[in-house]
C-alpha cells in the first residue's frame, strides 16, 4: 500500500504500530491472562445487567432496525447487527450504571468499551478465545497509556474527557490486533481513531446515565470498531497521527508526554492496574462504602444510633458524587442507605424510590461530605474516612486500599460471585454458571461465537 503522507514516521508510531500488529500472536504472562479473563467476565456481567437499564434498553432499541444486517450480538437480546452497532449498544449497556471496571491512572472505564468492541470484531471474524483475551489486554494497555501521554491534570479541571478518549483508542487497538493488521494498517487505524477522538466532561451533568453511558462506553467502542473496520475495507490514511503538524498531542494534549504511549509495552500490563468494583456504584464512593460497612459490622451501628456522620474524601472527585440525583453516584444517599439497610445490594443502589425513603432521608440529613486535598495525593488513591457519632460514642474508619483495586484485589470467588449475582436475573442461574465456567476457560474456546447462547435473553 502506498504511503499517503510525506511526513517521516516517528519512532514512537513505528514501535507502537509494530507492537499492536504483533499483539494477537504474542503470549501473555499467566497472571495477565488470568486477570484479563476476570475483567472480561466482569464486563460481560455489567453488559447483561445493564441491558435491562435505561441506557442499555435505549442502545438496543437504537440498533434494532439493523437486526439481521450483521454478525455481531447485542447482548441480552436476540439481535444480530453490524459490529459498529453492536459495539455501541453493548458499550452503553456496559456502563448503564456503575457496575463496570475502572482504571485509576488512565481515568477511564476500560471494560465497558474494549470488551464489547473486541467481541464485535471477534464475532465478525470468527476468532477464538485466546486471541480475544490478548486483544482485550492490549486495549487496556493502549487506552490507559493514551490518556497518560496527553498529560491531563486533575479530573475537575480537564477540558477533554479521558473517559471518552481512552476507550476509543483502546478499542481501535484491540480491533487492529484481531484483524492482524500490518504496522502500516495499524497506524491508519490510529489515524482514524484520532480523527474521531472527542469527549467533553459535561457528562458530569447527566441525570439519567444515558449520555454518560454513551460517552464512557458506547461511543469509544463504536468509533474504535469503525476505525479498524474502515481500514479493513481498504481505507488509507495519514501515516503518523502522533507526530508532525496538527497531530494528536497538539490537538488534545494538556502537558503532553508522547513517550508515555509506548512506555514499557510488554513489560507493564495496564490491566494489572485496573480495578473491579466490589460495589456497583461510582468509583469515588467505593472507599466510603468500604468504611461505612466496616463500621456497621464492627460496631453494630443502626440508623437509630446515628447522631452525626462526617465523610472525608479526595477533593478532586468530590464534585462527581456530591448530592447527585442518581442513586448509584450519590455519596450521601448511599452511605445513608447502607446504614438504614445494614448494607447495600445492586437492586437497592439503583432504586430511585429509596432516594425519597423517609428513613434514608433522616440519616442523610445528618451527613456532612467534606473534600480534602491531602486525601487527593494520598496513596493508595481514592481513600475515604467515615466518622459516625452515636449515643454509645464516636467511631471512625479510614478506608485506605479500596476492595477490588490492585492494592486490595477481590478473589476469584468474589469476582465470579458478583458476576453470577448480576447475570442470574437476566439469563438464569444455570446459564450464569455456564458463562462463568466458559470465561474461566476462555482461552480454549474455538470461536467467540460459541458464547452467543449464554449471552442472549
Protein language model annotation of sequence segments:
Residues 192-201:
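Flexible glycine/proline-rich, aromatic-decorated loop/lid segments
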Residues 142-169, 217:
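Aromatic-lined, polymer-binding surfaces characteristic
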Residues 1-107, 208-225, 229-457:
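Terminal-appendage/accessory-domain detector
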Residues 124-136, 180-187, 237-240, 300, ...:
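Structural helix-adjacent loops and short alpha-helical linkers that scaffold large soluble proteins
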Residues 93-150:
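Hydrophobic alpha-helical hairpins/lids featuring a short glycine-rich hinge
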Residues 169-171, 204-209:
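Acidic/polar active-site rim loop that often engages polyanionic ligands
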Residues 104-111, 160-165, 200:
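Short helix-coil transition sites and intra-membrane helix breaks within transmembrane domains
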Residues 116-128, 166-184, 216-236:
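Active-site-proximal alpha-helical scaffold in enzymes
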